[in-house]
From Swiss-Prot:
This is Polyribonucleotide nucleotidyltransferase. The keyword Nucleotidyltransferase applies. Gene3D superfamilies: GHMP Kinase, N-terminal domain, K Homology domain, type 1, Nucleic acid-binding proteins. It catalyses: RNA(n+1) + phosphate = RNA(n) + a ribonucleoside 5'-diphosphate.
Length: 743
């Protein structure tokens, strides 16, 4: 017997969202379907009963999967089934994870698996904006401990109006695209891209999103109450010893505070912190440590956190000795590698990015074949974070979710600065060689430098900065930190990344770990971030005042041509024969496509002569022969009555024996013309019915003195009953010996 419970959320614009539970996946700890129009997602959540031994973190795993059947498509590939997660699916997982994770109890360490599956879509509504709502609702109807609910919505500003959960079409016209995750009371997560907007405009988008989220959270609470899942399961995942906690604090805090205010570097500071806890543990036997080591590690982590936070709040001293608004020292080097088309090193403190740029042609475009997005990308950014960047001794595996997420943020920060008509496909590769905080922002800065070094005429240079927050008493006492370290990110209350030009914000990413963060604090953080990124932008402009005027010598050259749609087939040729011939003869690469009723041809090569050669051949194909013009030609075949001459690519005409010279020849052999010989010819006429070309060579030669026009050959042949000559050619044009010219 089904016990189906549902709640409907009115979006206020004629659209609604329905949350339903009790019908599908009933063996999961919690399961809901979320429906908006023809878009249907199923979210399930399952949690282990006990914590993993020795686990001191929240082992949450979020999976988001889109089925190709949702839109009535077959997957690509040999197996014709869904494969590994796409970048889009991974990014959606991260959006959901970042909003959920802070709201699980600190002492809850059982494995939790959240699965969100797209089962139906119409290509109009965006399902990623519903994934957070679905995941939270599944937790709400379960007995898993969770201090929610939360929800996520996308807000876009289109034509000056903020729209909640816009369609794909609306998003294409938006100058603000924000994904916001929040509880009824607090913002938890923000991510988005913008077209150089002001801080106040971004904050207004967050406010609009939060109002919509409050309605969705209320609906989840009502759903949970209707289901009767108000009582959460009991758990005991941590063993505590309050006397030991006090002992760790009493014996270690003063020394930890001294290290926190010493202003030392990352590794020296880490070793000093480690020495304190090792000396504390030395007072216990191995048997005692077997019981107490895990608790000591937990309690000492709290001591480190308290020491760092108190040093900042009470004395304004940061771990590396900087003031709250101070940016770490920056050094920059451009054109640092000879091989890439552009390169730059950006180092800020102990964070360093070596970024390169590769320029490509249309054939290098990335094909994106997602369930709801089939397109080609011309601007790519890849972010790599090897273990050695933090001094870790471990193997490097494939690209992880973190790398995809950080690369996506940098990509969104820079992509609107690439001119829409830029002919090159651009790939930016950031390799993080050192990391101690805000490596994604180093990627943005190094990306700007490398693009300009490559000669990419970006609209404006972009810089980025990561902001942090230390707060207490519900935000009544707080310190905003500019250009945070890795430890300040880990031990602080906020990680707020902002990128932009001198005129406005281009991208942002924010994760908040505490309750009670007011909009006033956000405003102050954004203003401080603006001052910081403008300082960094100034350093970029000092090191590289102008974009390189031209591409580097070894970069590919690209030219574009526009031709009439009717000529596309002529340029390609049967089976691609003509376009392949152009590429073989010129050494250039030629791509052609129809755009807006025109043929757009992209010609690329390593040097200008090969491009010019290809352009010349294409112009010859699309050129319209003009009567009276002289053309260089090549004899393609010799017949008894004359020669066929190709005078433009793909265009042949008949050079009759009578038009070879002013003197008369009895046979074509007497002319000494050979197949493959190059001669100049003049176009005398174009037959209006057949389009055949009549050529002459003799009109280009000087007429002999006393020349007498001979009697027309056709009349004599007609009297003699002859079956040869021009008359027979016109009548028997299909024969191999009397073929018609190509036009």
């Amino acid at each position: 017997m089904l016990n189906v419970v549902s709640k409907t959320i009115d979006l206020g614009d004629g659209r609604s969202i329905k949350i339903e539970t009790g019908k599908l996946a009933k063996q999961a700890d919690g399961a809901v379907t979320v429906t908006m129009g023809n878009t249907v997602l199923l979210a399930t959540v399952c949690a282990a009963k006990d914590a993993n031994p020795g686990c001191d973190f929240m082992p949450l795993q979020v999976e988001y999967k889109e089925k190709y059947s949702a839109i009535g498509r077959f997957p690509g590939g040999f197996t014709r089934r869904e494969g590994k997660a796409s970048d889009y699916e991974i990014l959606t997982c991260r959006l959901v994870d970042r909003a959920l994770r802070p709201l699980f109890p600190d002492n809850y360490h059982a494995e939790v698996f959240v699965n969100v599956i797209l089962f139906s879509a119409d290509g109009e509504d965006m399902p990623d904006a519903l994934a957070g709502l679905a995941a939270s609702a599944a937790l709400a109807v379960s007995d898993i401990p969770f201090n929610g609910p939360i929800s996520e919505v996308r807000v876009a500003r289109v034509d000056g109006r903020y729209i909640v959960n816009p369609t794909f079409e609306q998003l294409e016209r938006a100058d603000i695209d924000l994904m916001v995750g929040a509880t009824m009371d607090n913002i938890m997560m923000v991510e988005g891209e913008m077209d150089e907007v002001q801080e106040s405009e971004m904050l207004e988008g967050i406010r609009v999103a939060h109002e919509a989220i409050k309605v969705q959270c209320k609906a989840q609470l009502e759903l949970s109450e209707a289901v009767g899942k108000l009582q959460k399961r009991e758990y005991s995942h941590e063993v505590n010893d309050e006397d030991l906690r006090k002992k760790v604090h009493d014996e270690c805090y003063a020394r930890a505070y001294e290290v926190a205010t010493s202003g030392t570097g990352k590794h020296e500071r880490g070793e000093a912190f480690e020495k304190i806890v090792e000396e504390f543990k030395a007072q216990y036997t191995e048997e005692e440590l077997a019981e107490k080591a895990e608790m000591i590690a937990r309690y000492y982590h709290d001591v480190e956190k308290e020491a760092m936070r108190r040093a900042i709040l009470d004395e304004g001293k940061r771990l590396d000795g900087r003031k709250a608004t101070e940016i770490r020292p920056i050094w920059i080097e451009t054109d640092c590698l000879p091989g890439p088309h552009g390169s730059a090193i950006f180092t800020r403190g102990e964070t360093q990015s070596l970024t390169t740029v590769t320029l490509g042609t249309k054939s290098d475009e990335k094909l994106v074949d997602d369930v709801l997005n089939y397109t080609k990308e011309r601007f790519l950014l890849h972010y790599n974070f090897p273990p050695f960047s933090t001094g870790e001794a471990r193997p490097q595996r494939g690209v992880g979710r973190r790398e995809i997420g950080h690369g996506n943020l940098a990509h969104r920060a820079l992509k609107r600065m690439i001119p829409t008509d830029y002919p090159y496909v651009v790939r930016v590769i950031s390799d993080i060689l050192e990391s101690n905080g805000s490596s994604s922002m180093a990627t943005v800065c190094a990306g700007t430098l490398a693009l300009r070094d490559a000669g990419v005429q970006i609209r404006k240079p972009v810089s980025g900065i990561a902001m942090g927050l230390i707060s207490e008493n519900q935000g009544k006492n707080y310190a905003i930190l500019s250009d945070i370290l890795g430890d300040e990110d880990h031990l602080g209350d906020m990680d707020f990344k902002v990128t932009g030009t001198k005129d406005g914000i281009t991208a942002t990413q924010m994760d908040i770990k505490v309750d009670g963060l007011s909009y006033e604090i956000l405003e102050n953080a954004l203003e401080q971030a603006k001052q910081g990124r403008l300082h960094i932008l100034g350093k970029i402009m000092e090191a590289q005042p102008e974009t390189r005027d031209d591409l580097k010598p070894h970069a590919p050259r690209i030219e574009k041509m526009h031709i009439g749609k009717e000529f596309i087939g002529a340029v390609i040729g049967p089976g691609g024969k003509i376009i392949q011939g152009i590429q073989e003869k010129s050494g250039a690469t030629v791509n052609i496509e129809e755009v807006d009723g025109m043929g757009v041809i992209e010609i690329s090569g390593t040097n200008k002569p090969c491009i010019d050669a290809a352009i010349g051949m294409i112009k010859g194909i699309v050129a319209m022969p003009e009567v009276g013009e002289t053309y260089p030609g090549k004899i393609t075949s010799v017949m008894p009555y004359g020669c066929f001459v190709e005078f433009l690519p793909g265009k042949e005409g008949l050079l009759h024996i009578s038009e070879v010279d002013w003197k008369r020849f009895e046979t074509i052999e007497d002319t000494n013309l050979k197949e493959g010989e190059s001669i100049n010819v003049k176009l005398l006429d174009i037959d209006p019915k057949t389009g055949k070309f009549k050529l002459s060579r003799k009109v280009l030669l000087e007429k002999p003195e006393g020349y007498v026009e001979p009697q027309p050959r056709e009349r004599r042949e007609r009297r003699e009953g002859g079956r040869e000559g021009g008359r027979n050619f016109e009548r028997r044009g299909g024969d191999r010996d009397h073929r018609e010219p190509r036009g």
